[in-house]
Amino acid sequence: STHKKTLDAINRYNDWPYIQKSIRPIIQAGHTHVHMDLIVGLPHEDFNRFGQSFNDLFSLQPHALQIGFLKLLKGSGVRRMREYKYVADPLAPYEILSTHVLPYDDVRFLKYFEDVFERFYNSERFRTTFGYIGQQLIHGETDAFTYFCDMTRAWLKEGNHKVNLKDIDQI
């Protein structure tokens, strides 16, 4: 997350301007594969705030931007934080299903979002295309999160989430 209130709640320090300044030249040099992670379900991060963190990380154009889902592992500090009203799958890996600011329907949509983003951006199969689109999203009127949300909605509308993985190239 790049949200200070979220980071404070989980006792993490993040100097975002310093991170940007440090990571951007590494990515631009092209000699090192940069993989960044973003977690769904952290405290105080609703759908829109998650989108802002996504846009912040996407603006760096990492080689991979992995979207994960908070897991409430037994004994973890975040599992004991009752004020965030976590609802999690009772079976391992104990992924969150909803939080105090992120309802189930948003978590479910973000699962589909993650799948679409993984297939199209992280797969690197469309690296040239998304290199161009990425620049438009960073500097244009539509932000990356909105673009990939729209792409996810279209994906769902067309029923592509039901397509067998081996048949995905036919879409």
Where in the sequence are the language-model features?
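C-terminal accessory region of radical SAM enzymes
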Residues: 92-128
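Intrinsically disordered, low-complexity regions
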Residues: 4, 110, 165-168
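Conserved non-cysteine loop/helix-boundary elements of the Radical SAM core domain that shape
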Residues: 1-91, 97-102
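Aromatic-residue detector
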Residues: 26, 68, 89-95, 108-112, ...
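Radical SAM enzyme core and accessory elements
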Residues: 115-171
